[in-house]
Amino acid sequence: MRILGINAVFHDPAAALVVDGRVVAAAEEERFSRRKHGKRPVPFSAWEQPERAARWCLEQGGIDVTDLDAVGYSYDPSLVDHNAEGLDPAWEELRTTYASRAPYFLESALPGLDPDIVHFVRHHVAHAASTGLAAPFRDSAVMVADGRGENISYLAGEYRDGKLLECATQSLPHSLGLLYEDLTEHLGFARSSDEYKVMALASYGRPRFEPEFRELVRTTGDGGFRTDPVDWAAFAPRRTGGFGQEHADLAATVQKRLEDVLLELARWLREQTGQSRLTLAGGTALNCVANSRLHREGPFEEIWVQPASGDSGTALGAALHLAAEAGEPIEPMPGADLGRGWTDDELRGWLDRAGVRYERPDDVADTVADALADNRIVAWFQGRAEFGPRALGHRSLLAHPGHKANLERLNDVKGREQFRPVAPMVLAERAAEIFGGGPLPSPYMLFVHDVDPKWTDRIPAVTHVDGTARIQTVDAAEKPLLARMLRAFADRTGLPVVVNTSLNTAGRPMVDDPRDALECFGSSPVDLLAIGPFVVRRP
């Protein structure tokens, strides 16, 4: 079957194509529109469809829209209770009205599409399928926690032989994701966008409000939880300027309480299912600190997290769910590089049209290693783009990890807060000697690891204030060019580690196409652009 998956209702609109149980393509609309998160997460944007991402997915698969067997839409408007506690009836009615007309909006966006083949898939089921069906093992327990779907904020269950068996759900208004979003907004950041900044800030605080939050956020013993309304100003004033210690302490408290609740839920789920493996999705699964506590202290032997755990991943999950429901065997997700890519000839054409001076060295990996060893900042544009929020060696900014000032340099390039860390990529075969306390390999930057004390002074740019790092391990069999660059850098410096952060500037989505890469290179203090086999140097 040829199945297109669509996410469109809240934020991070995306499309994915699954053919005969195999993931062919997946992309977020923001990479095409250049609008961060694709659109605003408000009810009157629910009609907008990821039409450019969808058209590209079909093109990548060589499929005409009339050849599709089904379209999975990751939201079921029939399940929404407009009068549920905590929801605004007028806003919910508007959102569900738009969502219910999605087949016709898609027909307009993709001429030739039969609206009768569009199927509504529950939001949390789509999240669950994106991880439980895409994981490298067939059976697992599954946990999905986010802000909200139609009428719930959490689903727990298990996959057995490709079928989802639900064990527990949590109805609104109780929501771990919305709790974290509320905190994000109180701390002066953008909700449904900047929650990762709160996670970083938490490392600078201590959870001194924990007794109060144990009462406000608690499990119920049956696989659910309660989140009571929080008077945030009672703990720290709403941030409108600089940060105070109370802001960091509040972030640390909520982060700790989130982790504790997830651990309790995981232990309950293990007892219910007997599964030894856990798969995670939903926006909360992008909290790599919480994931790491689940790995260290939780009851599961192995944890796999969907790299696109946010709402964009529900496009993939909706398509996989329909494929599994049709009885098709599902192949594990081949990796996160599911987006657009260009041939060498196409890249040369872009460079020629841009009128920039470029060269084709014998080995771009060696050239980049030389530049990094000389403490240059490199923009790295290679292969197909990543699906999800993490830069995983396809659209990256790279730097030398041995110079602490590079953290500030990169944060300045990207317009980021200085308290935020940058991440290391490391050769998979060398990871265990440098990083501990987390799962290895760790190819998707979804866990934090402790930096061995012998290495903290050697790689200060990637060592966070709490002595951890969110690593990406690089396997030469899966990413030969990236591994070759890392080995060349290690030969020159003795460090099998390179700083890796996403290739973008402040407020912009990650670079996707060659035009984006050239624009980013030209508008930021980056020394070298490695684009396919070509190199562009700063004049």
Give, region by region, the residue ranges found by the protein language model.
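Flexible beta->alpha loop and helix N-cap segments adjacent to enzyme active/binding sites
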Residues: N7-K36, P41-S45, T66, A84, ...
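Phosphate/ATP-binding catalytic cores across multiple sugar-kinase/actin-like superfamilies
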Residues: T253-L278
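Extreme N-terminal starter segment of soluble prokaryotic enzymes
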Residues: M1-L4
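N-terminal phosphate-binding loop and adjacent alpha-helix
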Residues: F32-I63, L262
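Short glycine/proline-rich turn/loop motifs
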Residues: R239-H247
